Regions:
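Conserved Walker A/P-loop ATP-binding site and its immediately adjacent core
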Residues: 30-37, 45-79, 148-153
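Walker B catalytic acidic pair
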Residues: 117-119
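Hydrophobic positions in the central parallel beta-sheet of the AAA+
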Residues: 21, 61, 98, 114-115, ...
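Conserved pre-motif I regulatory segment
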Residues: 1-22
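Inter-Walker segment of RecA-like/P-loop motor cores
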Residues: 78-109
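Hydrophobic residues on the short alpha-helix immediately C-terminal to a glycine-rich phosphate/catalytic loop
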Residues: 15, 36-40, 157
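Conserved P-loop NTPase motor "coupling/switch" region that bridges the ATPase
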Residues: 56-58, 113, 130-210
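Walker A/P-loop
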Residues: 17-36, 144
Length: 212
């Protein structure tokens, strides 16, 4: 049974730890991200036999409160022979699905796999700080239809990937502020070539309009 469209399988092949999976509504980001999780845990996505992982790590899915409450993710799990209910799962791993509002509950989790859905890691608030801490001790990916409008939107993900130590380093290397502004206001970015290369390294585009 074919579980993925060709464009989804291509995206899985391009994905890596710390990437942003980009796709619009209906592209199947949830299913594709779970396929990547299975692949990272030893599953053969090309086999004609049922998907089977080898001692999969615990899975945490951080999503919107609406998606958590409507059980949208729960509907995707059985396709990969998984369940958040241990009695219904063929694996011994733990699956947790929760909202961004509760992300601080998982700040001390280690050696697990995180899927951050409808990513909210922009700015420097509590969600971002917790996300960066989680990223240091776990494997993770982000799902987003709109990954970033400006270069500063990418700062948390760049830090989580180890490209920069902190926001200050990013600003020192890439941001020029307006000189006579009453408050910090960005005038322009410098060394943009490096930013473009880093963004290309983490973005995985899945344009379902191109599927064949």
């Amino acid at each position: 049974m074919k579980l993925l469209y060709d464009y989804q399988l291509k995206a899985v092949e391009q994905m890596n730890n710390g990437c942003i999976l980009c796709g619009g509504v209906g592209s199947g980001k949830s299913r594709t991200s779970l396929a990547y999780y299975c692949k990272e845990n030893g599953a053969d996505l090309y086999s004609n036999k049922p998907i089977k992982m080898k001692n999969p790590s615990d899975l945490y899915i951080i999503t919107t409160a609406r998606k958590r409450d409507t059980l949208e993710w729960h509907g995707e799990l059985p396709i990969w022979r998984m369940s958040s209910n241990p009695e219904c799962s063929m694996y011994k791993h733990k699956i947790t699905i929760d909202s961004w509002n509760n992300i601080k509950k998982y700040k001390d989790v280690k050696n697990a796999f995180f899927i951050f859905d409808e990513q909210r890691v922009v700015g420097n608030g509590t969600w971002v700080k917790t996300f960066i801490k989680i990223s240091k001790s776990n494997k993770w990916i982000l799902l987003s239809a709109t990954p970033g409008d400006t270069w500063t939107d990418y700062i948390p993900v760049f830090i989580a990937n180890g490209f920069y130590k902190n926001r200050t380093q990013f600003n020192n290397e890439h941001v020029v502020y307006k000189r006579f502004s009453k408050f910090p206001q960005i005038d322009r970015y410098i060394n943009v070539g490096r930013l473009i290369r880093l963004r290309k390294k983490i973005l995985v585009d899945m344009d379902f309009n191109r599927k064949t």
